[in-house]
Amino acid sequence: MLKRGRRRKTRTSELYEIAANSGTEIICCDLPRTHSVSAMTSSGSCYIGIDPFEIETEAEERVHLAHEIGHCETGSFYNAYSDFDIREKHELRADCWAAARLVPAQELICALKCGVVELWALAELFDVTEDFMQRSINIYCLKGILQPPCIVN
């Protein structure tokens, strides 16, 4: 919870521990377009690729890592060759998992009630990117946890 401007955030190292504890291997690789990727083998093993040379801040690393772990933890993978698989559905599931860890709903509500309402300030408070903060807010609006309009950019 937000007390005296401090909150207990999920540390980046904890995200690496979550991956390790679930048997997900993290590999550094060249990913100039996406910066990160996740995949599951037919045997159920998960792998996450991260390009450390494309990620500039710890907030970006946390967001990419949490999103990719979200794919692995929820089994939300799509088949690029299937006409019947909906990519956005799997991306939303991964983002929901990541938002729950990086921007917990009750802590976000508390921050908003305390007057932290600018997107940049919320992103800074939760140590995430502004883009991910907006996605988290959108997720909580879709779930009915926050009421639109949730925030003014």
Regions found by a protein language model. Give the residues of each.
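Active-site hotspot residues in diverse enzymes, especially metal/ion-binding acidic/histidine motifs
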Residues: M1-N153
